[in-house]
Amino acid sequence: MNYEFGRESGFINSQPSLAECLTSLSNPVGDAFQSSSIKSSALSPSTLIPPPFEQTVIGLNPGTHPRHSRSKQSSPEAIDVGPGGGTSRRLRTAYTNTQLLELEKEFHFNKYLCRPRRVEIAALLDLTEKQVKVWFQNRRMKHKRQTHCKENRDSEGKYACLDDEPEDEFEQEAGGSVAATLLERERQFQQNQFTSQQCLNGNNGESQSLSAALLNSNEKNLKHFPNVAPTVPNCASTIEADNRHSPGLDLPLQDFPVFSPSSFSPSFSDSTESSLPLSSETFDLFSETLTTIDLQNLSY
């Protein structure tokens, strides 16, 4: 009766004590409750707890249950399979050639579509409005990248041209400066030759002019030489006798431009009028003196 009452009370309370469980399992014949409790306290719990109770006690800790351990081991596989299988990713829309052609035509004329036009194109091409919208967004980004890359290439080409141009200009300037120096040297050489020729010609001309002037002066002096003799009228016969080869001795004294009768002093005229005899040597000395005076006057 006590055993049955204990089991009923255990099921009613639903929280049986450890002593009642040990009593019901160790003494099924029907020992007293006190004796069974004393005996169970003296025994070790490892020898008295059956395997089903160990499983129930172990089951109270969810972390050590094998079912939970298997679920924990399989969860990484599910995480790994998820991204690999691609079930979570959105499927990419596959456009046909006709759809792409029509979309490219529309993008060529209109890069931004209004909603009515987008709905119309989606109905014509058997697409959804969202698909058309996404395609135009992607196409605008692609066009922007292409334009940006093209601008970068053009700018790099321009910078390269600008970098190359100064070198070419420097080379051209260097070549031009060398050619200019060569031309300048050649021109200076030609000018030096021309000036040297002019100097030579000028020297020749001066020498010729000097020689011509000297000849003219000599001729004039030679012309004036015979006119000196008639300064002494009393000695005309001796001059004619000595210098018959000169035809200018017959000229009168008045035609001689240098000497005039008024230029003679009275003493000299008196001396000429006197009948003093003059030798030919004295007369020659006198005529030479007069000719030297005449040459000095002509030179100055």
From Swiss-Prot:
The gene is hoxa2b. Residues 59-90 are annotated as: Disordered. It comes from the Eukaryota. The keyword Transcription regulation applies. One of its GO terms (molecular function) is RNA polymerase II cis-regulatory region sequence-specific DNA binding. InterPro entries: HD, HD_metazoa, Homeobox_CS, Homeodomain-like_sf. It comes from Takifugu rubripes. Sequence-specific transcription factor which is part of a developmental regulatory system that provides cells with specific positional identities on the anterior-posterior axis. It is found in: Nucleus. The keyword NADP does not apply. Residues 88-147 bind DNA. GO terms for cellular component: nucleus. Pfam families: Homeodomain. Belongs to the Antp homeobox family. Proboscipedia subfamily. Its main location: nucleus. Transmembrane segments: none annotated. Gene3D superfamilies: Homeodomain-like (1.10.10.60). Keywords: Developmental protein, DNA-binding, Homeobox, Nucleus, Transcription, Transcription regulation. This is Homeobox protein Hox-A2b.
